[in-house]
Amino acid sequence: MNLLCRDESCSVYQMKNETGDGTATYYEVYPGVGVMYNDFHMEHCPSRKFEQNTHTFAIHHCREGRVEWEVSNGAYLYLASGDIMLDSSATENNHCSFPVSHYHGITITISVPEAVEGLGDLLSLFSIDLEQIEQQFALKARPFIMHGKSVPDHVISELYQVPDNIRLEYLRVKILELLVTLRT
């Protein structure tokens, strides 16, 4: 993945291979919390890898197209339009593909120790316990997928139509809202 540009609010990365190209636009919303807008028109790309020994989980949302991940033991996970997947650094992602060579979605990454340290009071104010969310969805054992429409889908869908002049503030509010909805 090559860095195309970076400014005070975001970094834009490009990926190219023989099957097409894609971009990922990354915003650091809070310490340890990032939002990445993914736009891919290719058949496959390298899988995302968390650094070893990290305590991180991710929330993936598919807006359009389809994405598949090959995980351990030859099993596959897929997301289609409206689907959400939660996974953790414990998930082994071996291969990522786009069966229809088209994928638009969002990935939210949360480094639990970094987020708790930087946002402890704010998380407490909203009764958000990141480790409890991990336990609720058993993310250390396996990914969790929500197919179709759900309350979290509604919250994430609002992230696709944000005016640039309020993007960072809006993302901050919506990430907190999303984490509150995951508690239910």
Where are the regions that the model predicts?
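Alpha-helical bundle regulatory/interaction domains
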Residues: 70-184
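N-terminal functional module of multi-domain proteins
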Residues: 2-104
